[in-house]
Amino acid sequence: LLYSRFWYKFLYDLGVVPTKEPYMRRTSHGMILGENGEKMSKSRGNVVNPDEMVDTYGADAFRTYELFIGAFDQSTPWSTQGLSGCNKFLDRVYNLKDMVTDSPDYSPELESLMHKTIKKVGDDIEKIKFNTAVAALMSLVNEFYKKGSVTRGEYKTLLILLNPFAPHITEELFEMMNFGGTLSASSWPAYDEAKTIDQTVEMAVMIGGRVRAKIMVPADMAEEDIK
């Protein structure tokens, strides 16, 4: 990685490039270790063949797991079970197509969560926090299943947000749902900042130093009014 800067400095001295530094910030990825937590090597017998993983679970599941496995810049042990989990997650995304309603809008009960998820996934991608972006999408899918349905608007947004991590299945689903055009050429969904802010918060009711109940109150309610 240091060579990128070394060669750039050399080119700068020759007057080929306009600036002294090649980049404002450099991020290097961590190492994927064997399942035993040690560095992968043939002598240790803990090498994972990516071709075999793709043949078994598919390229999308493999790609999603690689980005979900941990923080981008941290070394993390491999887990075939974790890859299987990402494969099941994509299966759930695929099966959602049978639960889609005709509404082009977000459902009232999930509107706030949709805007929060759009904001989080976009911000996390820019900050190279891919693992937490995928986690947010997993949570969103869980909410769709809890509700028992997903609107066309919600499903379209989900596919666009998931596309950077699982491009093949999302593009296929986008076409199957007749959303129009290609997913890769679609605009990133916008969010309303006001709708990312919780309107109510949960507060514990304590009696005698012990929590006796929990109530929901407006987020902007004054402390005296709550009392």
Regions found by a protein language model. Give the residues of each.
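Alpha-helical recognition segments enriched in aromatics with Gly/Pro capping
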Residues: 1-72
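Generic structural signal for hydrophobic residues
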Residues: 3, 7, 158, 169-170, ...
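Helix-rich, typically C-terminal accessory recognition domains appended to large enzymatic cores
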Residues: 16-22, 52-216
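Generic "edge-of-domain/loop-turn" microfeature
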Residues: 33, 210-212, 222
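Short clusters of small/polar residues that mark proteolytic maturation junctions
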Residues: 44, 216-217
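Amphipathic alpha-helical transducer elements in NTP-driven molecular machines
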Residues: 47, 87-90, 223
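Glycine-rich, small/acidic residue-mixed loop/short-helix segments
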Residues: 217-227
